[in-house]
Amino acid sequence: MRKQYWFIILTYIIMQFSALIAIPLLFKFGYAGGQPTDENMLHAQGLWSVISFIACLVVVLLILRTVPKETLRNGQKDSIGLSILWAIAGFFIALFSQGIAGSIEYYVFGIGRESENTQAILDVIQAVPLMIIVSSIVGPILEEIIFRKIIFGALYEKTNFFFAGLISSVIFGIVHADLKHLLLYTAMGFTFAFLYARTKRIWVPIFAHLMMNTFVVIMQLEPVRNYLEQQSTQMQLIIGGLFL
C-alpha cells in the first residue's frame, strides 16, 4: 500500500477521535457559556463534526493529488456514460441489498430495524442542520475513499473480490459502531465494492453512497415521515371506500 494511503487512513482515524479532545476544549473556552448540558453537547458534537469532517476531506484530497493516477488492477475504466448508469443503478442496488440484509436481521436473528447510528445522526441533524452536509456528502466521499479505494483496492490487488470485499465491508461496519447491524453494513459495503470493481471509477460508489444516505436521512426527517403517514392513511381510506 502506498505511504500516502497510510497518511490518509491516519488522518481519518485522528478525525474520528478528535471530538474526545475538541468538544471538552470548546466548553472550556466558553462555548455555550461553558455549560455541557445534553442539548449543548448535541450542538457541540454537530458543530465539531462539520468542522472536522470537512477539514479531513480537504487534507485527504490534497494527499490524493500526490498519488499517481492508476486504475484498479490497472484495468480499463468503463465509459463515462456507462459509469453514470451504474452510479444511478447502484443507488437502487444499495437500497435493495440494505432491504435484504435488514430482513435477514429481523426475521432470522430477531434484530430490530432501528439503527442507533442512524438515529444518533438524525438527532444531531435536528440540532445542527448543517450536519446533513456531513451525513449526505462529506461522509460518503471519505468512506468510499478509505474503505473502497484504499482498503478494498489494496486487498483486491493481492487477493480476490470476495475476500477484499468482505474484509473492507466488515471494517466499514465496525467503524459505524452499530455492531448489531453489521450484516447490513457489510451488504452495503459489498455493493459499493462491486460498483468500484465493475467501473474502476471511485466516483461511482461515491455517488450511489451519497444518494442512499441522502434518501435515508430525508425519509427519516419528521416532516417527511408525517407527510408519508398522512398520504398512506388517505390511500387506505380510498382503497377501503372502493369496497363499501
From Swiss-Prot:
Its main location: membrane. Keywords: Cell membrane, Hydrolase, Membrane, Protease, Transmembrane, Transmembrane helix. One of its GO terms (molecular function) is endopeptidase activity. The record marks 209, 213 as: Transition state stabilizer. The gene is ydiL. This is Putative membrane peptidase YdiL. It comes from Bacillus subtilis (strain 168). It is a multi-pass membrane protein. Belongs to the peptidase U48 family. May function as endopeptidase which proteolytically removes the C-terminal three residues of farnesylated peptides containing the CAAX motif where C is cysteine, A is an aliphatic amino acid and X is any amino acid. The active site is at residues 143, 176. GO terms for cellular component: plasma membrane. Its EC number is 3.4.-.-. It is found in: Cell membrane.
